[in-house]
Amino acid sequence: KYMPLLMTAAGTIPPAKVLVLGAGVAGLSAIATAKRLGAQVEASDVRPEVKEQVESLGAKFLEVKSDSDDGVGEGGYAKETSDEYKKKQAELLEQRVADSDIVVTTALIPGRPAPILISDDMVKSMRPGSVIMDLAAENGGNCGFTKPDEIVDINGVIVDGTINIAGTMSVHASQLYSKNVSAFILHGYDKEKKEFNLEDEIVSGSMFIHAGEIVDERTKSAIEGSN
């Protein structure tokens, strides 16, 4: 299927409809790419404050009406939502998913399995030839049919659960990773004292173990829960 609107002597072909779930770094990049290719793009996120970012890229923001900041967690990251919110979200997405040619899912919750946003019934409502690209597959996926590192066909609908996508672009992935590691070290390391500044919130927020003790609360909870 073509992505952009095409007007030809033989008739008009409407643009592809792309739905992006999760408007973090990956989601915003997917929105920008789809718009650049000429698609009609909609996006949704549990954090209402990203609406401006989504709309600045030319996409329509699908907002779940809620009286609270239900999906906003510590540091502005997404968190687990209430059952009532999930019900409203499912009602909002049901028809949008059915109408989409491509669905890109990127929704993740720090320290938790990826939330299921696309039910089995939603997948079955999509047209044959439609594609779901589940970028959350490594954490379980946002689609019920997702199988990590596999591509499955559900009645003609392709569900792509490829993991480590960055590894397919290894040269640039390595460049970006090394640049970020260097920036982190240069920011947090005190050259004169030859030690990391533990009072820096970036350093302290990235630390798992110090002086032989687990200092990260999520890591501590996960270990205690497995015992």
Question: PLM features: what roles do these ranges have?
Answer:
Residues 102-160:
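ADP-ribose/adenylate-binding Rossmann-like module
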Residues 46-48, 66-67, 108-109, 136-140, ...:
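Short, ordered loop/turn segments at secondary-structure junctions
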Residues 1, 6, 137, 143-227:
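Adenosine-phosphate binding glycine-rich loop
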Residues 17-19, 39-42, 60, 101-103, ...:
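Structural motif
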Residues 34, 104, 181:
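Residue-level signature of catalytic and energy-coupling elements of molecular machines
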Residues 64, 95, 100-107, 205-206:
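Catalytic or ion-coupling anion/metal-binding cores of large enzyme and transporter domains
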Residues 2-96:
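Glycine-rich phosphate/diphosphate-binding loop of Rossmann-like nucleotide-binding domains
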